[in-house]
């Protein structure tokens, strides 16, 4: 596992964004872990979060023109990632996000920031049902831009209602690559080398066996 992935897991644990235990998800599934990126909510947390996204972007080698953060959770992510790319790698990319409702006065339309053109990298926290991606695709298509890729914090790598995960459905439907800072397999790898979290290894493996893709 790359060092930045290991560091991100430790960071998420330290902020209680990632927890191991027994949790009931909205879907009704019993999960041995829970991930809530909304708890990255201080200036220091967001600055650090942006650095991890920036490292994942550099590791991916993806070529893109504009960062896009879907409202609402993607907005602070796109902003902090744009800053981190400049500070860490001297890569200066424009960023853009959407309003949920279009304004009829002031700065018009439903987009704020850079024009949405060229190859777009969409950044968000997780993909659960893919709804935000589908809504974003309408905006990207309306601006004659192209979705180059999607970057999220965590890929749960689990089945949706069918055999595919929500991420696999997005990749299939839009022909783009979805990549993540960490995925479920990274969590298991982390636990395998951790005395503190070793008690959760069996339940994590069982969950992967039942729901993994």
From Swiss-Prot:
The protein's required cofactors: Mg(2+)
Pathway: Pyrimidine metabolism; UMP biosynthesis via de novo pathway; UMP from orotate: step 1/2
This protein's record includes keyword Metal-binding: no
Pfam families linked: Pribosyltran (PF00156)
Annotated positions binding 5-phospho-alpha-D-ribose 1-diphosphate: 26, 72-73, 99-100, 103, 105, 124-132
Catalytic activity of the protein: orotidine 5'-phosphate + diphosphate = orotate + 5-phospho-alpha-D-ribose 1-diphosphate
SUPFAM superfamilies: PRTase-like (SSF53271)
Alphabetical list of CDD domains matching this protein: PRTases_typeI
Cross-referenced Gene3D superfamilies: 3.40.50.2020
Cited PROSITE patterns: PUR_PYR_PR_TRANSFER
Highest taxon of source: Bacteria
Disulfide-linked positions: none
Keywords: Glycosyltransferase, Magnesium, Pyrimidine biosynthesis, Transferase
Protein's UniProt keywords contain Magnesium: yes
GO biological process assignments: 'de novo' pyrimidine nucleobase biosynthetic process; 'de novo' UMP biosynthetic process; pyrimidine ribonucleoside biosynthetic process
Top EC class, one word: transferase
Similarity comment: Belongs to the purine/pyrimidine phosphoribosyltransferase family. PyrE subfamily.
NCBIfam families, per database record: pyrE
Function: Catalyzes the transfer of a ribosyl phosphate group from 5-phosphoribose 1-diphosphate to orotate, leading to the formation of orotidine monophosphate (OMP).
Protein name in UniProt: Orotate phosphoribosyltransferase
């Amino acid at each position: 596992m790359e060092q930045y992935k290991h560091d991100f897991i430790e960071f998420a644990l330290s902020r209680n964004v990632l927890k191991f235990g027994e949790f009931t998800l909205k879907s009704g599934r019993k999960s041995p872990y829970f991930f809530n990126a909304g708890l990255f909510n201080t200036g220091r947390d967001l600055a650090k979060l942006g650095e991890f996204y920036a490292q994942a972007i550099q590791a991916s080698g993806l070529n893109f023109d504009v960062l896009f953060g879907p409202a609402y959770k993607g907005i602070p992510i796109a902003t902090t990632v744009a800053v981190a790319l400049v500070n860490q790698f001297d890569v200066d990319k424009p960023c853009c996000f959407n309003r949920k409702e279009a304004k009829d006065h002031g700065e018009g339309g439903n987009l704020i920031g850079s024009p949405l053109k060229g190859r777009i990298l969409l950044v968000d926290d997780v993909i659960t049902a893919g709804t935000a991606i589908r809504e974003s695709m309408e905006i990207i298509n309306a601006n004659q831009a192209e979705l180059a890729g999607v970057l999220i914090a965590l890929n749960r790598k689990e089945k949706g209602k069918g055999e595919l995960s929500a991420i696999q459905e997005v990749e299939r439907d839009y022909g783009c690559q979805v990549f993540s800072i960490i995925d479920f397999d990274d969590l298991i790898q982390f636990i395998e080398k951790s005395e503190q979290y070793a008690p959760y290894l069996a339940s994590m493996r069982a969950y992967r066996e039942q729901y993994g893709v």
